[in-house]
Amino acid sequence: MNEFPLHQLANIDVQYEDNHVIVAVKPPNMLSQADKTGDTDILTQLKEYIKIKYNKPGAVYLGLVHRLDRPVGGLMVFARTSKAASRLSAQMREHEMGREYLCVVEGRVKDRFTCIDYLKKNEYLNKVEICDADEKGAQLAMLSGECLARKNGTALCAIRLQTG
């Protein structure tokens, strides 16, 4: 018996699919993968989608190549084979696959900008926080951005991550 009825999978927006990869839209506030909360995640939903669409018995392999934070919506790439997972993961490591975001921010923003900070995970709050470079667990985080439009004290920015 399938874990999810088909009507619950209808909100899965698959943008591209072949024998090696599947690209789908992760809605904002959905997890990328299962966690201890038990909340809905796109990885589990897509495995069920593949199981139903292709009438696959048993467990379905789907490799998680990257994640998006829970509040973030956008395209995610998943590997349908272990070989594709290995190759896509290597592309992510070598920065051959870009990670770009659009965001709306308040306040003044330069036309082009770079942010360099150090981040560490707060396990208790399950969030990442800015910290000093010498703090235990600190990791370098760099991004560049460009302001695309301004209106009423807000700015639409295109962001490109240089680091994970």
Give each language-model segment a name.
Residues M1-T163:
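RNA pseudouridine synthases
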